[in-house]
């Protein structure tokens, strides 16, 4: 009798574990590597140089005492010509304890993919990291962006494009609203859902927190103009830059 109950108990535990695995995977809570860019214009630093020492200091600092509460930090170290500027931004649902693992991964990933580059950017699902020898605070980066899209198409492309664009525009307005605050700080992030026919679209937009609200709206407005190029009729898509990004999918991909 006890063996029967033991088997039932084990099967129940397995079922719960499978359910949890399915729940996590259905939310697509991954931290996959997406893309990187190594700057050719800023040159490379030499081993043991002042620039390398400044960079190492900043990177070790942000991974240990970074501002993970709001998932953002912009910091600098050194003096010209060895100034180092570093920025990280975690996704809007990946602050606090969820932010540091992504930043640590990004630091090691950037060192590996862009060794000794003075300027470089790397994107993961849940964060981005940028190093530079040039200051960029409150400046929109119009050059470094890219897009990813689902190869599958919607049957009613025209309706889907119209309604998804409307959702993203609504979220862009919300994210860049000067009254959208967390305490006294601009949120610069918004997420939402919309039913289109039989499908439910989940979407988000976000700006880096060095931007003021007007610059955030300007940045989002710019990348939303790339929707036809990126996402025409696609079941999922995103445009990512270093200053702002958007994403939509036919499945939930954000934490509550």
UniProtKB/Swiss-Prot annotation:
<dbReference type="InterPro" id="IPR050581">
    <property type="entry name" value="CRR_secretory_protein"/>
</dbReference>
<comment type="similarity">
    <text>Belongs to the cysteine-rich repeat secretory protein family.</text>
</comment>
<dbReference type="InterPro" id="IPR038408">
    <property type="entry name" value="GNK2_sf"/>
</dbReference>
<feature type="domain" description="Gnk2-homologous 2">
    <location>
        <begin position="142"/>
        <end position="253"/>
    </location>
</feature>
<protein>
    <recommendedName>
        <fullName>Cysteine-rich repeat secretory protein 29</fullName>
    </recommendedName>
</protein>
<dbReference type="GO" id="GO:0005576">
    <property type="term" value="C:extracellular region"/>
</dbReference>
<feature type="signal peptide">
    <location>
        <begin position="1"/>
        <end position="26"/>
    </location>
</feature>
<feature type="domain" description="Gnk2-homologous 1">
    <location>
        <begin position="33"/>
        <end position="136"/>
    </location>
</feature>
<dbReference type="Pfam" id="PF01657">
    <property type="entry name" value="Stress-antifung"/>
</dbReference>
<dbReference type="InterPro" id="IPR002902">
    <property type="entry name" value="GNK2"/>
</dbReference>
<keyword id="KW-0964">Secreted</keyword>
<keyword id="KW-0732">Signal</keyword>
<keyword id="KW-0677">Repeat</keyword>
